[in-house]
C-alpha cells in the first residue's frame, strides 16, 4: 500500500494523483498521517512514520479473524479464492497456516498422515482432485480437535458431516458422500497443490 515511505516514489515516478487507503484510515491519528504523506509528496522524500501499523507475523492470526473473506479477496485484487469449496459447518471461521496434501480420489492415507504431523493452529488443505469418494470423516476430525488443528479444506469429498457439525469443526469441501475410499498411501505432503483452482503452498495463510 501507499504510505509516507512510498508516496514520494510515486510522485517521483510521475504520478499526479496518489490514492492512499489504510495508511490514513488505520492510523491512530488520521490527520497527522495525512499531513506526513502530503509532506513526503511535496518534498519527494520518503518519511518513516509509526502512525501506520504494520502487523508482525504473530499478530496476523488475530487480524485475519477480524477481517471478512470478501475484504481479503478485494485486497488481493479478487484472487486466491477457492472455487466450489463450500462450508460443511455454517457459522464458523478458520484461520491458520496450511499443511498441504496431495492424494488420489478416495485415498485417505495421506490426509490422516497430515493430521499426525499437524501443529496447533494449522489448517490441513487437501487436493483430492475433486474425487467422489470421501477422504475425510469423523475420526480424522476428532484427532484434529484433540490436536487443536484449526480446520480442513478439501478439494474432494467429506463424510460424517452430522458428527462434524456437532463438533463445530471448521470443515470445507467440494462434495459430501458417505462412502470412503481405500487408504492406498499414494500422494505427498507439504508440496504446492491446487485446491478449488487456487495454488496453495505449505505455510500459506488460509482464511
Name each region found by the language model.
Residues 54-202:
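Feature captures the catalytic cores and cofactor-binding loops of soluble hydro-lyases/lyases
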Residues 7-8, 34, 140-141, 203:
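Generic hydrophobic/aromatic pocket-lining and core-packing "Φ" positions
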Residues 10, 21, 76, 144, ...:
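Buried hydrophobic positions in well-ordered alpha/beta secondary-structure cores of metabolic enzymes
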Residues 18-19, 153:
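Conserved beta-strand positions in the central sheet of alpha/beta enzyme cores
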Residues 16, 22-25, 202-207:
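A hydrophobic, small-residue-rich beta->alpha segment in the mid-to-C-terminal subdomain
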Residues 1-5:
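Glycine-rich beta-to-alpha transition loops that act as phosphate-gripper elements at the mouths
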Residues 12-17, 168-170:
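Glycine-enriched alpha-helix->loop->beta-strand junction motifs that scaffold or abut catalytic
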Residues 11-14, 22-50:
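C-terminal helical cap(s) of enzyme catalytic domains, especially alpha/beta-barrels
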